[in-house]
């Protein structure tokens, strides 16, 4: 428990942002959207007493919070994007829930971006609870925030935001994992296209994320997700070695986590 009893709660995470080009950002989003099951298995670190079988409940709190009132505002993308137009159309169904006027914040029930800009006027609450009325402005979109696990930011970065806070000694493990896969994107795409993991479990990526967030997996699930994770780790490791900054050392705890009590992957 935290000492700030007047505050509802804190959600922590291990997040990182990397620069991407306009040419590559959709490929990055599509690829990393597909490896969330392995990330759930490798980085789950948010158990909750009332959800006994879940090693990763962080997703639940995001998806069932205010941010998840609109399905397309949080989590894993439900489709693969081929064009910028498709991506923008998807984001039109994500949420607007506040605006800034004269340096003050005003909040309202989440509404899709498309519906927000179709309004002539809207009502919002000030920080003191006063109801105010405003006209939508194009600049309001500058403050738009959706909560997907791979998010394009206005800084021209992709923010990877689905990883739980890690133990202090392994803080850089997920960062190195993301960096290595990003630096080896072509090989990552080839792995995701051919892996036996998806042939066995299908390609409903949201469902797979939940499935491999559980504490107890079947022998088949355990074996397949370990093999998939090991392949992704090798892909990241290869790229980090080529970078020449010794960043691959941060992956060692992840390799160790795949070894069982008998020293077998």
Regions found by a protein language model. Name each.
Residues 1-11:
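Well-ordered mid-protein domain cores that form the structural environment of catalytic cofactors
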Residues 7, 23-30, 34, 38-44, ...:
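C-terminal accessory/tail domains of diverse enzymes
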Residues 14-19, 158-160:
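Short cationic amphipathic helices and targeting signals
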């Amino acid at each position: 428990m935290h000492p700030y009893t007047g505050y509802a709660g804190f959600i922590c995470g291990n997040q990182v942002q990397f620069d991407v080009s306009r040419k590559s950002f959709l490929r990055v989003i599509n690829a990393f959207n597909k490896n969330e099951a392995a990330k759930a298995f490798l980085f789950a670190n948010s158990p909750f007493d009332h959800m006994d079988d879940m090693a990763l409940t962080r997703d639940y709190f995001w998806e069932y919070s205010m941010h998840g009132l609109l399905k397309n505002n949080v989590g894993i993308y439900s489709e693969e994007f081929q064009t910028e137009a498709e991506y923008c159309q998807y984001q039109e169904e994500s949420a607007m829930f506040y605006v800034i006027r004269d340096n003050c914040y005003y909040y309202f029930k989440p509404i899709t971006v498309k519906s927000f800009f179709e309004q002539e006027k809207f009502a919002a609450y000030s920080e003191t609870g006063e109801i105010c009325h405003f006209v939508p402005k194009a600049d309001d979109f500058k403050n738009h925030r959706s909560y997907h696990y791979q998010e394009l930011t206005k800084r021209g970065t992709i923010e990877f935001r689905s990883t739980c806070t890690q133990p202090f000694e392994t803080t850089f493990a997920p960062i190195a994992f993301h960096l290595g896969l990003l630096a080896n994107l072509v090989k990552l795409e080839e792995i995701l296209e051919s892996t036996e993991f998806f042939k066995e479990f299908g390609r409903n990526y949201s469902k797979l994320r939940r499935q491999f967030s559980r504490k107890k997996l079947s022998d088949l699930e355990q074996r397949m997700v370990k093999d998939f994770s090991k392949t992704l780790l090798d892909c990241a490791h290869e790229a980090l070695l080529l970078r020449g900054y010794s960043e691959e050392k941060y992956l060692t705890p992840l390799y160790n986590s795949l070894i069982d009590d008998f020293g077998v992957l």
